[in-house]
Each structure stands twice: as structure tokens, then as C-alpha cells.
């Protein structure tokens, strides 16, 4: 039967998870990309660490071995839109976790299909409203390739496009209301003072 497979953890926690600056940066990233938990962010950091480790390992190889293995890594990264076709290993080392998160299906759907927030796009993906080509994809963290990016669209039975158009048309236009003119009211004339004071007896 063979040895059983033990799944390896695909994410690692930061060394100082309670650091204030790190926590604020993580919360900002969670809001920007609509992540549900920090675990999704840690997965991106772990994957980035793996890719950068491969790049550093290639830099340490002999030139002939590096020339054989480097195109394999660069082609795989260019396929998912992380680097350009003429990028170098230095470009790989300059990648950030935000670069990986920007290739998620949730992020691309937010920008491409006109959602206001990434959380709206996440709900649409999870409930099967998004298709890539002829197949539905309900995984928000799915990594979209460059070839697939132009084939992302709503499912034919989805009513979300009509809802988005309706919300756009019902958005109240900003009207400039002129302030009412102030009415000038003349002050009443002062009562005439007594012509002569009372005479002393």
C-alpha cells in the first residue's frame, strides 16, 4: 500500500506575532485584499519565502547548471503574472506578499468586474457566480494565470451584474443646494424717551 502521506503545513506564523507594527500592517493587508483570516496572509508569505529560496539557490549554482534550471522557475512565475517574460532572478528576490495576493481570483474579480469591495467579490466567488472560461471556480485564493485573466466573467444565471448596474443607477447624485437668502428685517424704531423728566417737588 505504500507509506501514508502526511500533509505538510503550508503556512508559518511570524516570529513575533504580537508586534504592534506587524499587527497593524497585517490588518491593513487583510482589509486591502479582503482576506478572511491572517492564515491566508501567512500562506502568501510562506509561498513567497519558498520562491525566493529557489532564486537564491539558483544564484549559488554554477553558470551551466543555473542556465538549465533558471528558465523553469522564471517560466512558472511569468505564467501566473508575477514577473515579466524578460525578468531576472533579482526581480524574483524583489517580490512581495502583495504581489502574490494581487494574483488571487478574489482580487482580480474585484478590479475586473466592478465590485466595490473585495469582500463582495469574495461572496460572489464562494457562491458560484464567477466563471473562468467554461468552468465555475469557487475558491477565492485560486491563483489566476495570465491566459485565464481575460476569460473571467459572471455565470450566465448570475443576477449580480443587474444588481451592480441597479446600484450604480440608484446612487444619489450630488446636488448643489443654494443657501436661502437671508431676510433683512429692519429693527423697530426706539421708543421716544420722555420729553422732560419729572419735576422735583
Swiss-Prot record:
Gene name for this UniProt entry: rps4
GO biological process: ribosomal small subunit biogenesis; translation
Assembly mode: Part of the 30S ribosomal subunit. Contacts protein S5. The interaction surface between S4 and S5 is involved in control of translational fidelity.
Biased composition (Basic and acidic residues): 189-201
Family (UniProt): Belongs to the universal ribosomal protein uS4 family.
Residue ranges constituting the S4 RNA-binding domain according to the UniProt record: 103-167
Alphabetical list of InterPro entries matching this protein: Ribosomal_uS4 (IPR022801), Ribosomal_uS4_arc (IPR022802), Ribosomal_uS4_euk/arc (IPR005710), Ribosomal_uS4_N (IPR001912), S4_RNA-bd (IPR002942), S4_RNA-bd_sf (IPR036986)
Molecular functions (GO terms): rRNA binding; structural constituent of ribosome
Keyword line: Ribonucleoprotein, Ribosomal protein, RNA-binding, rRNA-binding
Listed HAMAP family: Ribosomal_uS4_A
Upper lineage: Archaea, Nitrososphaerota, Nitrososphaeria, Nitrosopumilales, Nitrosopumilaceae
PANTHER family noted in UniProt: 30S 40S RIBOSOMAL PROTEIN, 40S RIBOSOMAL PROTEIN S9
PROSITE patterns: S4
Tagged with keyword rRNA-binding: yes
Region (Disordered), start-end ranges: 163-201
Domain of life of the source: Archaea
GO CC annotations on file: small ribosomal subunit
Protein name: Small ribosomal subunit protein uS4
Biased composition (Acidic residues): 172-185
Main function: One of the primary rRNA binding proteins, it binds directly to 16S rRNA where it nucleates assembly of the body of the 30S subunit. With S5 and S12 plays an important role in translational accuracy.
Classification via Pfam families: Ribosomal_S4 (PF00163), S4 (PF01479)
Amino acid at each position: 500500500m505504500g507509506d501514508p502521506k502526511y500533509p505538510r503545513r503550508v503556512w508559518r506564523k511570524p516570529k513575533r506575532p504580537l508586534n504592534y507594527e506587524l499587527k497593524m500592517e497585517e490588518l491593513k493587508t487583510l482589509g486591502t485584499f479582503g482576506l478572511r483570516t491572517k492564515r491566508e496572509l501567512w500562506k502568501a508569505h510562506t509561498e513567497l519565502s519558498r520562491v525566493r529560496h529557489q532564486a537564491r539557490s539558483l544564484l549559488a549554482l554554477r553558470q551551466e547548471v543555473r542556465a538549465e534550471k533558471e528558465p523553469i522557475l522564471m517560466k512558472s512565475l511569468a505564467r501566473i503574472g508575477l514577473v515579466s517574460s524578460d525578468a531576472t532572478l533579482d526581480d524574483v528576490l524583489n517580490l512581495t506578499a502583495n504581489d502574490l495576493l494581487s494574483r488571487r481570483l478574489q482580487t482580480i474579480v474585484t478590479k475586473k468586474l466592478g465590485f466595490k469591495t473585495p469582500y463582495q467579490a469574495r461572496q460572489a466567488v464562494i457562491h458560484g457566480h464567477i466563471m473562468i472560461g467554461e468552468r465555475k471556480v469557487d475558491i477565492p485564493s485560486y491563483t489566476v494565470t495570465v491566459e485565464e485573466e481575460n476569460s473571467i466573467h459572471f455565470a450566465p444565471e448570475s443576477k449580480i451584474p443587474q444588481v451592480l448596474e441597479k446600484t450604480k443607477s440608484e446612487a444619489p447624485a450630488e446636488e448643489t443646494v443654494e443657501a436661502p437668502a437671508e431676510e433683512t428685517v429692519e429693527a423697530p424704531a426706539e421708543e421716544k424717551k420722555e420729553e422732560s423728566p419729572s419735576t422735583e417737588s
